[in-house]
């Protein structure tokens, strides 16, 4: 999160209203707080962040995998952000 010259950048690096950014995080946290949501997030993590590529991986494959990892990491960051938002209320 960054706040420069009254510009609020969300976790994803996009400029938006701070309230809207918090709402996005709260919605994501709510979605993944269910038992099914927790299982889905665990599955996504297992096939992205926890996946190890061998030395023979191509540049294109690696870029594809890193994009997937970024999205799952962003979801997890949004969940942590939502917990901070709730604690600040």
What are these regions (language model features)?
Residues 1-89:
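Intrinsic-disorder/low-complexity detector
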């Amino acid at each position: 999160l960054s706040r420069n010259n009254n510009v609020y950048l969300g976790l994803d690096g996009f400029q938006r209203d701070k309230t809207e950014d918090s709402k996005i995080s709260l919605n994501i946290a709510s979605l993944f707080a269910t038992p099914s949501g927790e299982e889905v997030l665990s599955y996504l993590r297992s096939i992205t962040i926890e996946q190890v590529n061998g030395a023979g991986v191509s540049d294109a494959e690696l870029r594809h995998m890193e994009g997937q990892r970024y999205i799952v990491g962003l979801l997890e960051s949004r969940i942590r952000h939502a917990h901070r938002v709730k604690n600040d209320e």
